[in-house]
Every structure is written in C-alpha cells, then in structure tokens.
Amino acid sequence: MHVAIMLACTAACADEPQEKPGVAPDPREFILVNGTRDPVNKSYRKMLNGMALFEKMHGMAPNASLRFKLLPRQRDTKMDGIVLEIVGDTVTIPVLLAADRTFTLERDQQALDENASVMPNRKASSMTWRTEIRTPGLPPNTRRLGDLRLECHVGMEAGLISNTLPVIGLATNLIQGMLDFCNGSDVPYLFFSERPLFSVTMAAGTRREILSVDELYAGVSFGRTSKADLAYCDCQVLLDRTYFLPLGDRSWPDDTLIEFEYMDDGNDPQGAVAPSVAVTNRAPQ
C-alpha cells in the first residue's frame, strides 16, 4: 500500500524538470516567473489534456464546471500575491487567479507548440495542485461523489499531484493508464476538505456509512500511510483536511453525497443522523 501511495503522489513528476548529473540544465527550467528558481510548475499540454478528459467524461458531473486550484504544502508558503503564467520559449501568458486560488486555462496553440509550462512564482515543494469540480446547489458542507471521481480522473490526466522525487516514466504510465488508477478498489488519491476534519459520511438514499479513521488524515493514524511516506505526499500542511474515498466502488452512485463534520463545528455527528436510518462504519481496507 505504501508503494501505491508513493507512486500516486509521484505521478506528476515526470513532467517536472529534474537536474541530471553532468548535464547543464536548461535555464528556462530554473529561472522562471519573477525570477523564481526551481518553481512548482506543471505541463500546460498535460493540463489541457485534463480539460479534454473533463469534457469527455462530463456525464459523471453534468452540472459541474472545471477549475484548477493551488494549495499550500509547507507552513511558510505565502499564498497571497501569487503570480501565475503560462511560459514557453517566446510566449508568456498571464493567468487570472481568483481569490480562492482557482483558475482556468485557455487553449493557445503557440504555447502548445513551445511545450509551455504553467508557472506560479513559488518554489517546488511549496504548493500542490488539484482540480475543483463542484456541482452547484448542494447542501452546505457536502460534496458529490461523481464530482470527486472526475476530479481524480482529470487530476491524474493533468499530472497535478506534486512531489520532489524523480520518477521513471514507466511508473507514471502505469499509474495513469494501464492500472486505470481512479477506478481501483482502494484508490490512494488524496482529497482536501475546506477545514480540518472530524468525520466524513457517505450518504445515498437511506444508506449511510461513516468513513473509518484510516481513510482520514492521509491514513497516518492507523498505519495506512507511514510517517516516512508523508515525505512523498503533497499533504504536509493540510494533513488534517485529507481523506480517501472508495472511488471504484460502483455500489455508491455518482449522486452520493459526501458529508463533512469539521473540528470547529462542535456537533456530535451521530446526533445529526435520523434514528430510522442505519449507519455503519466503513471497515479499514
């Protein structure tokens, strides 16, 4: 399991520049937006591929739209004043970053031809990236499972998960292709909630299941993820907001609601459940 998590958390690194011994690095790979060296950049081409996959699989979240999102990895990462650009050999295109640090990308053929990167003025390992796919009109403190399934598919296709380890291309191809990663029975794809989590409940009609603790906090509490493996994860500063979901379990329909109880709510999550509804805890995998 630790190997799977490490591979999942390293899936995007094949597109990030790695310095090779004895080979002078391409200056463009290290001196980037506003002079930032070794930036937390992503492949523009792969992110557009993710957008194309979103359109192809839009039926999974028919009323939702796609945005990308920046999240901190380190406690000292400054998330205000981020400058985001698409940068190629000769082209530089500013990207508008919303107040919630989400953004969209426009297709630019010149940027594609120049194999451009999407670059914020922050260093590698300081931030991570995710997709944000949200169906409007859901109850407060809920997400929709189909949206989150699609977030996984698009995020993997776009190469968003950040890491500092070098990864061979074969591992990336296995994760993103042949293994059909997001449809697995025990998918180690980390999601992030808005605030520190107390519990997560899956609800579909009268069926309700509370996620076990090993599916929260990157699985550290019950050994699903070792503390050593956290070095290969992109969740360091947001560990208390992380959770896994049974994405490949099709007994849960796409319209399943994911309900969040937060640490600062001060509510008893069991007390919010109607007595006539059976509640079970998902057993650790």
Question: What is the predicted function of each stretch?
Answer:
Residues R130-T206, L211-S212:
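Short helix-loop boundary/capping segments
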Residues R75-N163:
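Structured domain cores in non-transmembrane regions
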Residues C9-A11:
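N-terminal signal peptide c-region/cleavage motif recognized by signal peptidases
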Residues D15-R107:
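N-terminal Sec/ER secretory leader and immediately downstream segment
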Residues L245-Q285:
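Short, low-complexity, Pro/Ser/Thr/Gly-rich segments in the mature regions of secreted, periplasmic
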Residues S43-R67, I168-F192, D255:
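Contiguous beta-strand segments within globular domains
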Residues L70-L96, Q176-T225:
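Extended low-complexity, serine/threonine- and proline-enriched intrinsically disordered segments
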Residues L105-M127, Q236-D240, P246-E261:
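Noncatalytic modules at the cell exterior or secretory-pathway interfaces
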